[in-house]
Design a protein with these regions (language model features):
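Conserved Class I S-adenosyl-L-methionine
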Residues: 191-269
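A short glycine-rich, Lys/Arg-flanked "PGG" loop and its adjoining helix->strand segment in the class I
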Residues: 127-142
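Short, glycine-/aromatic-enriched active-site segment of Class I SAM-dependent methyltransferases
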Residues: 148-168
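Class I SAM-dependent methyltransferase SAM/SAH-binding core
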Residues: 47, 53-103
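Short alpha-helix
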Residues: 169-184
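A short SAM/SAH-binding and catalytic strip from SAM-dependent methyltransferases
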Residues: 113-125
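Conserved alpha-helix/loop element of class I SAM-dependent methyltransferases that forms part
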Residues: 24-42
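A short acidic, Gly/Pro-enriched loop at the edge of an enzyme's catalytic core
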Residues: 102-113
Length: 269
């Protein structure tokens, strides 16, 4: 969905510049729950859309015994994920390829389950992402997504500003459900609790537990990231990054921004 660059570097951009591995709110507990609602079982074929460094894809293969394909727009991420799968001894069951989530490079009906973890709202055309997810899942198969969700009462201007600061586009739960329906999904379900609790937004590190806002990066990581921001955006970029962080945490703590899990089926042929 279209955003402007008024608030660069966004939250998403700062995490990218930090070079650390982060995952979605709720951490691996959310990934485990996604596997549960999809009823994953050994031998099933799963597509992880916007697979990043491959952490979740490897988890699905290990935890549920499924065959996993991952697709990501970044060739660097694809290389990193492929190396991680090889180190995990799963190169024969977890494979990655470069591709756009708005034009997924697989044939229709290829997968039993298609998941997208916190990356539907990043591309400009989120509807195209959902359309493609429904296209490549088999008839009767399951699609799973989890995404940031507006909560409470916000004006359109507030939503636009927060989305620009965040670097992704949250929607109201009813809007995500409507978009899944337009893509052809049926039997749509949503789960907001416990995923919308503020503490879930700090659980984005795979290497350690984060218990409070502002502690996602360590002091050393913050200093290193600030230097990278300054090189690209100047001192104004550092000020903007702190401003965005404060606005983001305030929205979470005030209950304006939440997180939800959605799952649905493609109708059987």
């Amino acid at each position: 969905m279209k955003r402007n660059d008024t608030h660069e570097p966004t939250i998403e951009r700062v995490i990218e510049l930090s070079g650390i591995e982060t995952i979605h709110p709720g951490g691996m507990a959310m990934t485990r729950r996604a596997g549960e609602v999809a009823a994953l079982a050994p031998g099933m074929r799963l597509l992880d859309v916007s697979s990043g460094r491959g952490t979740q894809a490897i988890y699905y293969a290990r935890q549920f015994g499924v065959e996993v394909s991952g697709v990501d727009i970044s060739e660097e991420m694809v290389r990193t994920a492929s190396r991680s799968a090889a180190r995990a001894g799963l190169a024969d069951r977890v494979r990655f390829r470069q591709g756009d989530s708005q034009r997924i490079p697989f044939s229709s009906g290829t997968f039993d389950v298609v998941v997208n973890e916190c990356a539907v709202g990043i591309p400009e055309n989120s509807q195209a992402v959902l359309d493609e997810m429904l296209r490549v899942v088999r008839p009767g198969g399951v699609v799973v997504m989890h995404e940031s969700t507006w909560r409470g009462s916000l004006s359109p201007a507030e939503k636009d500003e927060l989305a620009d600061r965040y670097g992704t586009t949250p929607l109201e739960s009813a809007e995500w459900i409507e978009m899944l329906g337009r893509a052809g999904a049926r039997d749509i379900r949503a789960e907001a609790d416990p995923w919308s609790r503020p503490e879930m937004f700090w659980k984005v590190r795979v290497d350690r537990d984060v218990r409070r806002p502002g502690a996602v990066l360590t002091p050393v990581e913050k200093a290193r990231t600030a230097l990278r921001i300054a090189r690209r955006y100047g001192l104004a970029g550092i000020r903007k990054a702190f401003e965005n962080e404060r606005a983001f945490y305030r929205a979470v703590l005030d209950g304006k921004l939440g997180y939800s899990l959605y799952w649905a089926r493609r109708p059987a042929a």
